[in-house]
């Protein structure tokens, strides 16, 4: 894999800096199973104290060091905190799903039994000896049952995203499986996501209804938007603004604008703070590309040295840790490495 292959388009990378918003319903992520977005935070929903409904994080503990039993795909990272309520029980929060999705990132490295053991250790590292420990284990088993049920669907639940009827059926099917396997955890795990998907699907149905005039479509879309809770409506407005910003960034990149010219343009459309974040992102991206290129060269030398698979992987993991020292960088590099391997 070349350094160029490791580059995400700047407009897409901007999500890390608060410039972009939600993915469209037609995106692949809508139909994926578990998919915690690691390290960089790109395009993922990060645990949020407010979203946890006032839930407190688990009592502060030292995070497990990367060398303590972490699979290579998670090297250099630490698990999200499991939230607790005021009584010390596991809080019903999306943050719990984020924790398990983080652990599931390692499923390509581990057998099912080893993955279970890994999750048990990660839970114990935060909740050992508490009532919440048993609760977290129970929720993990439920979540695994949910994912196993999804895997048994035809084509693992994949649908033709141009078939709105199939999308509706898939949504209903997944919601049913979630409620059956997760019970009262289905709402904190998937409630907000399902609401957004149903809303987006309703918009698509209106937009693609050939019996409606443009004026009627606009009227129905406006009425649908009024059904949104106030906070969701405000969030949607921000998303619309951010999508416009993405388009503008892409246009500036395509025109070959200099960093100073891009910053001046973005200051007009996004404001000085957002423009400064994009400028910083450019610098960080350039630094990343340079370091990944050097790393890829050294990794290729290790791969061609005729080492045993275990020695080769150990040396590459050590190289990755030396090269990428910021939180999440080693995980990102490992993910790019796996992508390079699958493309060969």
From Swiss-Prot:
| UniProt entry keywords in alphabetical sequence | Cell inner membrane, Cell membrane, Chaperone, Lipid degradation, Lipid metabolism, Membrane, Transmembrane, Transmembrane helix
Q: Which GO terms describe its molecular function?
A: unfolded protein binding
Which top-rank group of organisms is this from? Bacteria
Chief place of localization:
membrane
Q: How does it sit in the membrane?
A: Single-pass membrane protein
Q: Name one GO biological process term.
A: protein folding
Q: Provide GO CC annotations from the record.
A: plasma membrane
User: Which cell locations does it reside in?
Assistant: Cell inner membrane
Residue intervals passing through the bilayer: 14-34
Q: Which Pfam families match?
A: Lipase_chap (PF03280)
Question: Is Coiled coil tagged as a keyword?
Answer: no
Q: What is the role of the protein in this entry?
A: May be involved in the folding of the extracellular lipase during its passage through the periplasm.
Task: Tell me which family the UniProt entry assigns to this protein.
Answer: Belongs to the lipase chaperone family.
Q: Which HAMAP family match?
A: Lipase_chap
What protein am I looking at?
Lipase chaperone
């Amino acid at each position: 894999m070349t350094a160029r292959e490791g580059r995400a388009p700047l407009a897409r990378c901007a999500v890390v800096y608060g410039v972009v918003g939600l993915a469209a319903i037609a995106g692949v992520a809508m139909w994926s199973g578990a998919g915690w977005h690691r390290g960089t935070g790109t395009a993922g929903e990060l645990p949020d104290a407010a979203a946890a409904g006032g839930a407190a994080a688990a009592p502060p503990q030292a995070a497990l060091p990367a060398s303590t039993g972490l699979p290579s795909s998670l090297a250099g990272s630490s698990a999200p905190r499991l939230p607790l309520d005021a009584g010390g029980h596991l809080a019903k929060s999306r943050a719990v799903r984020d924790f398990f999705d983080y652990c599931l990132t390692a499923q390509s490295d581990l057998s099912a039994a080893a993955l279970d053991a890994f999750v048990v250790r990660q839970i114990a590292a935060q909740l050992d000896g508490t009532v919440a420990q048993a609760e977290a284990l129970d929720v993990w088993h439920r979540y695994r049952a949910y994912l196993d049920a999804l895997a048994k669907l035809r084509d693992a639940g994949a649908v033709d995203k141009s078939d709105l009827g199939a999308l509706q059926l898939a949504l209903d099917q997944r919601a049913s499986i979630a409620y059956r396997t997760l019970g009262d955890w289905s709402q904190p795990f998937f409630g907000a996501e399902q609401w957004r998907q149903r809303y987006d699907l309703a918009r698509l149905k209106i937009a693609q209804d050939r019996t409606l005039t443009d004026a009627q479509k606009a009227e129905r879309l406006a009425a649908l938007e009024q059904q949104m809770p106030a906070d969701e409506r405000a969030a949607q407005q921000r998303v619309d603004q951010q999508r416009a910003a993405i388009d503008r960034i892409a246009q500036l990149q395509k025109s070959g604008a200099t960093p100073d010219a891009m910053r001046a343009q973005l200051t007009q459309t996004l404001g000085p703070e957002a423009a400064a974040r994009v400028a910083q992102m450019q610098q960080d991206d350039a630094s990343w590309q340079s370091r990944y290129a050097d790393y890829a060269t050294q990794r290729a030398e290790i791969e061609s040295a005729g080492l045993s698979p275990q020695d080769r992987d150990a040396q590459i993991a050590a190289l990755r840790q030396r090269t990428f020292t910021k939180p999440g960088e080693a995980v990102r590099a490992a993910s790019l490495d796996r992508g390079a391997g699958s493309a060969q």
